[in-house]
Amino acid sequence: MTLPPSLRWTGDHLELLDQRRLPEEVSFLKLHQWRDVAEAIATMAVRGAPAIGVAAAWGVVLAAQANEDLDLAVSVLKSSRPTAVNLGWALDRIKASPAAQEPVDPQGLAAVAAALEADDRARTQTLVDHGVGLLASGSRVLHHCHTGAIATAGVGTALGVIAAGHARGVVRHAWLDETRPRLQGAALSAWELGCLGVPCTVIVDGASGLLMRRQEVDAVLVGCDRVAANGDVANKVGTYNLALVARAHGIPFYVCAPGSSMDRSTSDGDAITIEERPQEEITQHRGQRLAAPGAAAWNPAFDITPAHLVTALITEFGVIRPPYRDALQALPLDRQP
């Protein structure tokens, strides 16, 4: 089965694959206003740091076409998911373009958004090629959350490495954390790998330690929403746990990080804002209550994995190993798409 695109621009509106309806239904939202794009990002209709960055850029185009305040649109779009740096990265670039200056040029902004989308396709493909080269033949890879093609404008990051690795005879099997509470691993990663014919098994998040203890995992491969200047990584909550267990069992822990996810202005993980989502995502599932009545829940969407637990960062620039601070500082992150 051919995977649907995460988004597509029609010329006057943006169509977003509604990831909330997967795997049961493949459907697209038709968005004509920038506020609808912000809502789609906040409610996780579109997910994946690269994908939400590109979607937000198209949201700015919608604002320009409607002759609305670009500063307001950029501000609201930036706040829709605060942890993923790709969002600000894309919005800063489109806002700084000549087309965003008065008089605003909607067609020029559309060209910038299209360039950002094409840039993500190129970045992810190169990153995936570097990642496949790291894995030994016959690898069994453990993955957390969802980082596939529909989380980007291209082929994905960590899950893209797994898919390409299987196609090239390198990856034998994928273990997928279900990824509570939104179940991105069970719903999205398993669906995407199933479409591509990649053998995979979903596990509850708490089973990963036993799996590694039994020597069923050759590498852990995850994506990220932000990499700080020192190499600390913000990713879906539960990533830190995986890194600790992988270190305990001597299993390499790789983070796939396109340049758009790197934030040299943030000194370390402690300075990263962690989004906290509604407690109902934990206490309820599809309208059915799971937790005891009156039970409170804490729902951070992300956690921080310290740089010393990361075996390597897989980027479009190549594979980066510790120490990270100097290596990240040397990357040409300021180039324009």
Curated annotation (Swiss-Prot):
This is Methylthioribose-1-phosphate isomerase. The keyword Repeat does not apply. Gene3D superfamilies: translation initiation factor eif-2b, domain 1, Translation initiation factor eif-2b, domain 2. Its EC number is 5.3.1.23. GO terms for molecular function: S-methyl-5-thioribose-1-phosphate isomerase activity. It comes from Parasynechococcus marenigrum (strain WH8102). Catalyzes the interconversion of methylthioribose-1-phosphate (MTR-1-P) into methylthioribulose-1-phosphate (MTRu-1-P). Keywords: Amino-acid biosynthesis, Isomerase, Methionine biosynthesis. The active site is at 225 (proton donor). It is an enzyme of class 5 (isomerase). Pathway: Amino-acid biosynthesis; L-methionine biosynthesis via salvage pathway; L-methionine from S-methyl-5-thio-alpha-D-ribose 1-phosphate: step 1/6. Substrate binds at residues 47-49, 81, 184, 235-236. The keyword Lipoprotein does not apply.
